[in-house]
Amino acid sequence: ESIVRPPPVEAKVEETPE
């Protein structure tokens, strides 16, 4: 199984903290 899926949105929270 070589299915590449995008990272979870929660991971982007670290880059863009509110």
Curated annotation (Swiss-Prot):
Tissue expression: Expressed by the venom gland.
GO BP term, example: positive regulation of cell adhesion
One Gene Ontology molecular-function label: toxin activity
Localisation: Secreted
Keywords per UniProt: Secreted, Toxin
Sequence intervals crossing the membrane: none
Coiled-coil intervals: none
Cellular component terms (Gene Ontology): extracellular region
Role summary: Inflammatory peptide. Induces leukocyte recruitment and adherence to the vascular endothelium when applied to mouse cremaster muscle.
Protein name: Porflan
Organism listed in the record: Potamotrygon orbignyi
